[in-house]
Every structure is written in structure tokens, then in C-alpha cells.
């Protein structure tokens, strides 16, 4: 990064950048968040150091390599970067990310989403990892403070799209979140065990006490577990 002391311009390289057409009317934060998490998300500590240096400068304009030149309300953009780079929670709500082979895990997820809304959750976001943009799913995980992972046991492991998703979280230093889990398996469900093992490198994760174990399809027992998770 370079600071022009004469015109008070910060040439921020990849920082504060985003993709997209400049003539499109769209919210800056949505694409900028995806861009940041995808490219810089792993390096929050380094971004924090840069922000500390930037705080001492009189910045009037920010010029990134990609995206619009920022000239107004710079505190808004700097504030978002502070949130993202410190792995803090940006938005209140619960994210549910799932994979479903025959539709039964999806039914459980949809029931959970409805229960969460009934219990007063301000926002519930549901992502089907097999059909959604994976980069946007990862972005959402860094946006919300609470996330539920729901997947099937597959070849004594977890369904590939969930594995890819969790790998995307871990390599970007996913942390400071509350995580709930739902597993589905016919005779030996072990998705929760696998997911927790994958997330071991992540810092400051709090796991919900209530976990949901589905044996192929929801029954009375797993429905009770689902309700307990929603209440938690």
C-alpha cells in the first residue's frame, strides 16, 4: 500500500477492492466482503496492523486495484474492514449450511429454520452447499455469529461439498463463532465427529450442547433434538 501525502490518497492494492461493473447499482459490502474473505481472509492479523497505521493518516480517498474509488463515508469502509479482519460478528442471525443426499437432511434443516424463526431469531439464512456459490457460503460463515452444519455420513467421512466448505473456513482462520451440528447416517452416523476434527485448528469456537442425530429420516427422538437445538 502507498499513501500520497499531497492529495491524501491511500492506494490500497487488494484492500477495499471488489469485482463488478462500476456502473451497476449494487451494495458495496456484499461483493467486497466475498472478495475480502476469499483473498485476504486468512491474513486478519496483518490487516489489523495495516489498519492501525492507517488510523494515523488523514485519508480522503481510497483507491483499490479493483472496484470503485472511495471518496465518501470512509469510516464505513474502514469499520467493515476492522470487523472482518478481527473475525468479529458483522450481522445478527443464524446461518445453516447443509448437504442432503435424498432430501431428509434438507427436511430437518427446513424444520429447524422454521423453529428458529418461531423462537424469535431475527434472521435465518439457509445454504445448500451442493447448489449454492461456495464462495458466498464461506462469506456468510464469516458474517454471522452462529452457524449450523448439517450433513450426511458418506464413506465413513462427510459429504464432499461439506468437506470443501469446512476446508474453506479452516484455511481462512475461521474463529469466534458458535457452531451447532446435525448428522445423518443409516447405521453409523459419524459426521459430527468428522466435522469437529476438521475444525480443531479454528480458535474460539463454541459448540452447542444439543446435537441432532438422524437415522436416515427424522423420527420423534431426532425431532426433539432438533427442537432443543433451536431453543439453544
Predicted regions and their residues:
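Short, charged N-terminal beta->alpha structural module
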Residues: 97-118
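Short gly/ser/thr-rich secondary-structure transition/capping motifs
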Residues: 79, 126-132
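FMN-binding flavodoxin-like domain, especially the glycine-rich phosphate-binding loop
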Residues: 19-62, 66-69, 111-127, 137-232
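Conserved beta-strand elements of the Class I
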Residues: 3, 10, 93-97, 180
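Short amphipathic alpha-helices and their capping/turn segments at secondary-structure boundaries
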Residues: 1-10, 51-54, 134-137
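Cofactor-binding loop segments of dinucleotide-utilizing enzymes, especially the Rossmann-like FAD-
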Residues: 14, 98-101, 129, 183-184
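Catalytic core of the metallo-beta-lactamase
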Residues: 1-26
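Short N-terminal or domain-adjacent regulatory/targeting segments
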Residues: 63-90, 164
Amino acid at each position: 500500500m502507498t499513501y500520497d501525502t499531497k492529495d491524501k490518497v491511500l492506494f490500497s492494492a487488494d484492500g477495499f477492492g471488489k469485482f463488478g461493473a462500476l456502473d451497476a447499482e449494487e451494495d458495496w459490502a456484499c461483493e467486497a466482503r466475498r472478495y475480502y474473505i476469499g483473498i485476504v481472509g486468512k491474513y486478519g492479523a496483518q490487516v489489523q496492523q495495516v489498519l492501525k497505521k492507517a488510523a494515523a493518516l488523514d485519508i480522503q480517498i481510497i483507491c483499490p486495484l479493483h472496484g470503485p474509488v472511495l471518496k465518501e463515508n470512509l469510516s464505513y469502509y474502514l469499520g467493515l474492514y476492522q470487523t472482518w479482519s478481527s473475525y468479529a460478528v458483522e450481522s445478527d442471525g443464524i446461518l445453516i449450511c447443509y448437504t442432503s443426499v435424498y432430501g431428509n437432511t434438507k427436511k430437518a434443516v427446513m424444520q429447524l429454520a422454521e423453529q428458529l424463526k418461531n423462537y424469535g431469531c431475527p434472521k435465518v439464512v439457509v445454504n445448500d452447499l451442493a447448489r449454492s456459490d461456495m464462495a458466498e457460503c464461506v462469506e456468510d460463515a464469516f458474517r454471522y455469529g452462529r452457524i449450523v452444519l448439517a450433513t450426511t455420513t458418506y464413506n465413513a467421512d462427510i459429504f464432499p461439498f461439506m468437506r470443501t466448505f469446512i476446508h474453506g473456513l479452516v484455511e481462512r482462520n475461521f474463529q469466534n463463532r458458535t457452531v451447532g451440528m446435525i448428522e445423518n447416517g443409516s447405521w453409523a452416523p459419524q459426521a459430527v465427529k468428522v466435522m469437529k476434527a476438521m475444525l480443531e485448528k479454528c480458535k474460539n469456537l463454541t459448540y452447542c450442547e444439543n446435537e441432532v442425530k438422524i437415522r436416515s429420516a427424522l423420527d420423534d427422538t431426532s425431532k426433539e433434538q432438533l427442537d432443543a437445538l433451536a431453543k439453544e
